Amino acid sequence: MSGWQETAEKLEMSWSNDVRWQGVERPYSGEEVVKLRGSLKIEYTLAKTGAEKLWKLLHEEDYVNALGAMTGGQAIQQVKAGLKAIYLSGWQVAADANLAGHMYPDQSLYPANSVPSVVKRINQALQRADQIQHLEGEGEVDYFAPIVADAEAGFGGQLNVFELMKAMIEAGASGVHFEDQLASEKKCGHLGGKVLIPTQTAIRNLVSARLAADVMGVPTILVARTDADAADLITSDIDPADQRFITGERTPEGFYRTNAGIEQAIARGLAYAPYADLIWCETSKPSLEEAKQFADAIHEKFPGKLLAYNCSPSFNWEANLDRATIETFQQELGKMGYKFQFVTLAGFHALNHSMFELAYGYKQRGMGAYSELQQAEFASEVKGYTATRHQREVGTGYFDQVAQTITGGTSSTTALTGSTEEAQFQK
């Protein structure tokens, strides 16, 4: 038996016997995967360990909740505060973190490698925080939190999905989600004008993403999102799975009208379940009743299937729910099987509101307002906050150690020694 065949057989045995792949269907063979790998095995440590960690969390925790991070610094603060995973939203990347350098709405207008770039940026920030902690010998924070990243509608067809998934893994993403919208007309799930692709086309995209992860040798968590609860357009009537929802009406662009709603979303969730690790139904309001309806329908056919839920800032929470329900909303979702829950645009709103409040106070009271921010930072240190000492936070001490190691401890140009931070911001 050749090494090629042996590797392929081991791969297929893992798919058959490993609990990780229970219920996951692949319409391709282990041999086909090995053919696409090339001769040199490359390890993707961050992506692999993160995916394994996230899978473990999803099965051991009541639920894993995350906030959308826009920057590496935001991700560090989330982990310091105790969150166990990071969410990376394409909406936020479009708004203020894409490689085009422009502000965009959530319509896939930015370069396709922008989200992988931010994944890499966040992982490098978390790595620096870990290096600082390791050097100082204090603290036990596990900074390498798994990142679940937004691949939107794949930025094209199945080959684009394949390449985008590879880029996500290379950057260190632990989980990636793909939605069933037409990439060229993609919209935020809470905007109008969304156009679905046929169910079988969406499944091919999921197969493509899984194939990419298998070729890379990484058990990436694959999340299938459907926008069918709100989307009332579809590109084609060719797929029998979609035909019962199509009204017969056409649009000027040639799209077909559909009966949007939870039944259409359930049908798609059921179709995607064998090809994804989690199913996410994008909703238009925070409704435990609708969440239960979707979960029950999925679990009737796929017991124990993991679900994801967007606790979106596009919802006016207090206009929809009372305070008591809001406080327990995530716990109730967790009981239904929504094991990954996230606030997509938390970073955007935290960044904008905190800066507006500071600027508003600063305009009125000058340094009094900034001093209050600084005092609030000092007060948060008992909770584990450390960015009050901003020089240390970004690694000045770490690079002082690099300099001392190079010079045998004789460097006279280290940065923290003699700094105002050393003099005025001691613990």
Swiss-Prot record:
Official protein name in the record: Isocitrate lyase
GO biological process: glyoxylate cycle; tricarboxylic acid cycle
Transmembrane segments: none
InterPro entries assigned: ICL/PEPM (IPR039556), Isocitrate_lyase (IPR006254), Isocitrate_lyase_ph_CS (IPR018523), Pyrv/PenolPyrv_kinase-like_dom (IPR015813), Pyrv_kinase-like_dom_sf (IPR040442)
Cofactor(s) listed in the protein's UniProt record: Mg(2+)
GO MF, one annotated term: isocitrate lyase activity
Superkingdom of origin: Bacteria
Protein family (similarity comment): Belongs to the isocitrate lyase/PEP mutase superfamily. Isocitrate lyase family.
EC number: 4.1.3.1
Active site: 188 (proton acceptor)
Reactions accelerated catalytically: D-threo-isocitrate = glyoxylate + succinate
Enzyme class: lyase
Keywords recorded for this protein, A-Z: Glyoxylate bypass, Lyase, Magnesium, Metal-binding, Tricarboxylic acid cycle
Pathways involved: Carbohydrate metabolism; glyoxylate cycle; (S)-malate from isocitrate: step 1/2
One Pfam family from the record: ICL
Native organism taxonomy: Bacteria, Bacillati, Bacillota, Bacilli, Bacillales
